[in-house]
Amino acid sequence: MPAPTSRLRAPEELGKNAAASAPQINQNEDDVLIDSSAPLPEITTTSQDADTDMHVDEEGRPLFTPITATDGAYRIENRKVPVPPHRMSPLKAAWPKIYPPLVEHLKLQVRMNIKSKAVELRTSKNTTDTGALQKGEDFIKAFTLGFDVDDAIALLRLDDLYIETFEIKDVKPLNGEHLGRAIGRIAGKDGKTKFAIENASRTRVVLADQKIHILGGFRNIRIAREAIVSLILGSPPGKVYGNLRTVASRMKERF
């Protein structure tokens, strides 16, 4: 842009100066600018897929189609549950009832290793539940502790079930005949006391020598444990029955 104080020039002179200042194009250069005979690069037009189309509802909120399931990469995990020697024979006898829930419900791969006396669990590409392996391990452990198969299967169906284990000596150090009497008070004649505790607290109890295993919910386990502890400390069964009736009536009112 010329300065405001510069001398005015004629239009012809301005045209000559502009032509002189323009860069000269060498006609002999071999630069290829655009060749009409050369094939043009293919231009692909992408259309939106039906799965990625965005739809809007009446309130203006976007609605997206669900993602289709794909076969992604998965990691194989293994668990090895040891089986005590005295539970190998019951395991072999109940094996037709043990493996179907693990294979059909949890989609796990299961095998019984007789040589190492263990049950081996492994995930597969069909396993969808992330906690399937842990549930399967808890199920096998419950059976090895002495619970019935039908009771142990509840661990696969319900998430709020636990197993609590304690010994009689943890409550009171007993030896000899005193220990035998304590176990007898817990079991009762023909298992009557144990069944009464199970029915009142809605749990399952296993007496394995000096160890006691309780399967059930958190509050139910506490009720059964208090009754068993009272029997170990020497409370008469009649008093324990009365307390169980009171607790059972309260549970019915609550639920």
Curated annotation (Swiss-Prot):
Main location as per UniProt: cytoplasm
GO cellular component, one term: cytoplasm
Region annotation Disordered: where it falls in the sequence: 1-31
GO aspect biological process, one term: ribosome biogenesis
Disulfide bonds: none
Keywords: Cytoplasm, Nucleus, Ribosome biogenesis, RNA-binding
Signal sequence, renumbered to the chain: none
Domain KH: from-to ranges: 176-228
InterPro entries: KH-I_PNO1_first, KH_dom, KH_dom_type_1_sf, KH_PNO1_2nd
Entry's localization field: Cytoplasm; Nucleus, Nucleolus
Pfam families reported for this sequence: KH_PNO1_2nd
UniProt GO molecular function: RNA binding
Family: Belongs to the PNO1 family.
Subunit structure: Component of the small ribosomal subunit, ribosomal RNA processing complex (SSU RRP complex).
Described function: Required for small ribosomal subunit (SSU) synthesis. Has a role in the processing of early nucleolar and late cytoplasmic pre-RNA species.
Protein name from the UniProt record: Pre-rRNA-processing protein PNO1
Organism: Coccidioides immitis (strain RS)
Lineage of the species this protein comes from: Eukaryota, Fungi, Dikarya, Ascomycota, Pezizomycotina
Gene behind the chain: PNO1
